[in-house]
Amino acid sequence: MREETREQPAPLRSGLTTGSCATATSLAAAKLLLTGQRDDAVDITLPKGKVVQMRLEFCRLIGECAEAGTLKDAGDDPDVTHGALLYSQVRLLAEPGIGFVAGSGVGTVTRPGLVLAVGEPAINPVPRRMISEHLQRLADACGYLGGFEVTVNVQGGEQLALKTMNPRLGILGGLSILGTSGIVRPFSCAAYIASIHQGIDVAHTNGYTHIAACTGNASEDTMRRVYGLPEIALIEMGDFVGAVLKHLRKVPVPRLTLCGGFGKISKLAAGHMDLHSRHSSIDLPQLAGWAADIGADEALQAAISGANTSQQALALAHAAGIALGDAVCAHALAFARSVVPAQVHVEVFAIDRQGGIVGQAGVQ
């Protein structure tokens, strides 16, 4: 009998950023105005020189303007904007230059601390440059000496933005037009880490001296309850504690609180910078060793080492009067202090699934 061979998974498919979509739709609309040519697809050049073709959903004249739209294709990345209609409207200006406007579903910057000034449409620098370069090349080819006004829109963008970090960063009214390479890499962490850095920058620039980096909603709720911190001072770090700690070398906020579930804090205590289960695991024998340091007998150490979960290990220690939660937080604190500058005061909280505090260290 022939042995069956396991089917190999297909490679994940990359997509294109909102910045690439805005570039393609702006180019198509401007081309219609300057040449009368109505395209079904356009070629754009990405920042590293790769040329890609993007299909258009429409390209049409509306009075003195033209608009073109495309569907955002994020490939196999679980991007909140995947499948959204992004469209740009272009108007010709008498004077040279390119102006950008936040249309429907695109946000506006309302707080200092980001790369864009307050009041600017949330169209990031690389997409602006991509759009400007493509429109300037078109203008040169057509002998056009005037300028362009580009309004970028995302259908449903105001609702989609509520699923992003934009409201917390002070980007209101819609999404940001993003991208540095023009390409969306499936399951890339770059965008999430960038939002963590932006959150710290915005809090710091707006004068907040105490921020809390939290692994999830329960830990954020705990920090609101304990310290009454506003949204701007709460950093949703998820599993990327390393992104927080390393960024504080550049932006040394005076006081940092780290808060997360006991299992994740135990990973931090063991020196892990990425707390996701793909990249780090809970070391139960290490927990047993820390319990031994604060008085656990051999039987309890064995029980902790053989526990099914970190929560069970914590419960076993608690029943024996061993403050394992505090011990784990103390080790997490020591590791965090080894990464951040000395002037940053760090404290650590561990919580259970209900948001109850099961350990703390360094608390003022």
Curated annotation (Swiss-Prot):
SUPFAM superfamilies: CbiD-like (SSF111342). GO terms for biological process: anaerobic cobalamin biosynthetic process; methylation. InterPro entries: CbiD (IPR002748), CbiD_sf (IPR036074). The keyword Glycosyltransferase does not apply. Keywords: Cobalamin biosynthesis, Methyltransferase, S-adenosyl-L-methionine, Transferase. Pathway: Cofactor biosynthesis; adenosylcobalamin biosynthesis; cob(II)yrinate a,c-diamide from sirohydrochlorin (anaerobic route): step 6/10. It catalyses: Co-precorrin-5B + S-adenosyl-L-methionine = Co-precorrin-6A + S-adenosyl-L-homocysteine. Pfam families: CbiD. Transmembrane segments: none annotated. Disulfide bonds: none annotated. One of its GO terms (molecular function) is cobalt-precorrin-5B C1-methyltransferase activity. Its EC number is 2.1.1.195. It is an enzyme of class 2 (transferase). Belongs to the CbiD family. PANTHER family: COBALT-PRECORRIN-5B C(1)-METHYLTRANSFERASE. This is Cobalt-precorrin-5B C(1)-methyltransferase. It comes from Pseudomonas putida (strain ATCC 700007 / DSM 6899 / JCM 31910 / BCRC 17059 / LMG 24140 / F1).
